[in-house]
Amino acid sequence: MTANLAGDVTMRYVDLPPSEPADAVPVLLLHGFGTNFGMNWSAAGWPQALGGAGLRVLGPDLRGHGGSDKPLDEAAYLPERFTADLLGLLDELAVDRVDLVGYSMGSRLAWELALTAPDRVRRAALGGFGPVNAFADADLSAPGAGDTPFDQVFRTVSGLAGNDAEALAACARGQAARPFAADPAPVGVPLLFVSGARDTLATGAEDLAARCGGTHVEIPGRDHANAVSSRVFKQAVVDFLVG
């Protein structure tokens, strides 16, 4: 399915009903940089885990990714443009309130959405996310050309089928133009942070959780690339949303 949002962006998304109807708000899944709903969430079994817990799943491909439009202007990728997209999608679907589950860049956007529109967010689970600047030391005029952790990620994702390297570069510059700030934190939205014990891109997640009154779960033996498929991650989120 697609939604025509404000401006010139068309967003592709899926809307998956739960296995058994339940009285719960939908869950909006927000994927990481250079992936899409299918790669980040479906392939890791998240629709089944959440649907089996009685939760409706909303899964957009964020702008610049997957089957959604891919503008080439970095201003199109400022965090506030993403949050406007997500609020527009909720309005299109007549969904008043959601739970958020993000991973990596998707967690940054979940934080921003909870900060911008706390009345639309019940709870937020943030995976693979910490206060560290993901773009530190990277030359974003030529992403992928260096040896920073971000350059390594960019080289990997820019070569994936369906990705547009120019759009991803613009996305990186747009995100970097608004560095993450832990203060202020979302108010009135319970937060769960989940990170792999070997995740060098989400360092500081435990400290961030403590600073904003959230809860942190560490996944033994997992890094940034494989934490999202962990049963520990899925169970922690289901318990947080349903328990």
Which stretches of residues belong to each language-model region?
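Flexible "cap/lid" loop of the alpha/beta hydrolase fold
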Residues: 108-116, 122-149
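Active-site nucleophile elbow and catalytic-triad environment of alpha/beta-hydrolase enzymes
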Residues: 166-183, 198-200
